[in-house]
Amino acid sequence: VCFLTKLAKINHRTGIGQKSINLGNFYPVLCAYLDGEFYECVYYSDGDPFVSECASYQVVLTVPKEYTVAATGKVTSEKTLESKKEYTMSASNVRDFAIVLSDCFEVAETKWKGVDIKYYYYNDETPAAHLAAAQEALEYYSATFGAYPYDIYSVVQTGFCYGGMEFPALSLISDALNEQNCVYTIVHETAHQWWYVAVGSNQVENAWQDEGLTEYSAALFFENHPDYGFTREQLVSDALAE
């Protein structure tokens, strides 16, 4: 597959923001095959109008050398080519391949049970706390719903029109969020690594299996981690208000 595209200046799944570039839902994926035929659906502006099957990817990305890359897969090789860098990345059994890049990124990282957990940010006074929230969410969901299926998980601060967005092994977090909403969004988007990414669902026709289960999972997390200051009643009230 060969194609050329011009990115819009927009804070969305795919677009150029002031400090980062989002490449989400831009890469060709396998069309879902359901009930003996390929599944076709209209793109909706609300929700997550995608139905994605699993595949394995090897991606080569060439960017100006000043840019740091966060992606669905692990970087398996990195080469400097004069003023550019070439990254080779791979990911197995994922439903999509997404990338965020910026020349402003700093990276906080840790390791948990063989999983590399990374937090990419450019405007954050408490990056260690947000990295810890991602790790605690992974730990809780793994113990509650089953082991996290990948060996890397990245949370990325970026320009985005909503609170956040989920991709396999990669969560986008809006740079416009306050502290409380940032923590909530990290926990919420991390739950999507089970509900959509690991389990899979028809996000168009059965959206409750995506956002519904994710919101429920986040409520369970905060119920078991009261130090974050969220209650189930508060989360239900906020959801109903939307």
Label for each model-derived stretch:
Residues F3-K9, K65-Y67, F145-P149, W194-A198, ...:
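A generic secondary-structure signal for well-formed alpha-helical elements
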Residues E205-A207, E211-E242:
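Acidic/His/Gly-enriched intrinsically disordered linker/tail segments
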Residues F3-T5, I16, T110, L177, ...:
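Catalytic cores of transferase enzymes with a strong primary signal for eukaryotic protein kinases
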Residues S92-R95, Y140, L213-L220:
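Alpha-helical scaffold segments in carbohydrate-active enzymes
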Residues V59, T88, E106-N206:
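Juxtacatalytic substrate-recognition/specificity segment
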Residues R13-I16, A71-T76, C104, K113, ...:
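Short coil/turn segments at secondary-structure boundaries
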Residues C2-C104:
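Extended, low-hydrophobicity, Ser/Thr/Pro/Gly-biased non-transmembrane segments
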Residues A8-N11, F97, G163-F167, F221-G229, ...:
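Secretory-pathway/luminal and periplasmic proteins that interact with or process carbohydrate-rich
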